């Protein structure tokens, strides 16, 4: 698995570290991943269309997406330092093959309740998808 850039980085932070404009960075990294036999890419779900546009048009690479969040009991998203986050449903709608859920559970006020809520959301999304 290859990593594009961290979900905790903003676009400006990514540029400050990599010092390349996005299209060039995407194309170069995706070409390297394919050349070295990587089976997938770890990225924000928001990057999936860009990854496909700039080098994975044939969808050879699996998309594994961290930065999955859930609403807090107060209706606000739980980010825990992540800048580019999505809900499980949004990640699926954007084309994620797999999602990674960590801090949204482990750093919540009630990890069990949060895990149950996420499971329900994921199952509901899967059921809606299977009906189509």
Predicted features along the sequence, with ranges:
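Catalytic cores of alpha/beta
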Residues: 72-97, 113-118
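C-terminal helical cap(s) of enzyme catalytic domains, especially alpha/beta-barrels
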Residues: 92-94, 105-132
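A general structural detector for well-ordered alpha-helical segments in enzyme core domains, enriched
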Residues: 29, 47, 51, 87, ...
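Conserved anion-binding
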Residues: 1-64, 68-77
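Conserved beta-strand positions in the central sheet of alpha/beta enzyme cores
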Residues: 42, 99-100
